[in-house]
Amino acid sequence: MSKGTPSMGKMNKMTHIACRRCGRISFHAQKKVCSSCGFGRSTKMQSFKWDTKRPKTPTH
């Protein structure tokens, strides 16, 4: 495998397509799993604690 211009010719396939649940272009066409909401893997919406901004708390 070489890097650079020859490798760019291989980048013509759609890896991710639109997700039926969240609508984002995050549904992996081969794996059949959405990387954004977890559709295809889980019935619950994927969410993380670090994803939401928490209110500032006093430090002293």
From Swiss-Prot:
A zinc finger (C4-type) spans 19-37. This is Large ribosomal subunit protein eL37. GO terms for biological process: translation. It comes from the Archaea. It comes from Methanoregula boonei (strain DSM 21154 / JCM 14090 / 6A8). Binds to the 23S rRNA. Keywords: Metal-binding, Ribonucleoprotein, Ribosomal protein, RNA-binding, rRNA-binding, Zinc, Zinc-finger. The lineage of its organism: Archaea, Methanobacteriati, Methanobacteriota, Stenosarchaea group, Methanomicrobia. InterPro entries: Ribosomal_eL37, Ribosomal_eL37/eL43, Ribosomal_eL37_CS, Ribosomal_zn-bd. Belongs to the eukaryotic ribosomal protein eL37 family. Binds 1 zinc ion per subunit. GO terms for molecular function: rRNA binding; structural constituent of ribosome; zinc ion binding. HAMAP family: Ribosomal_eL37. Its cofactor is Zn(2+).
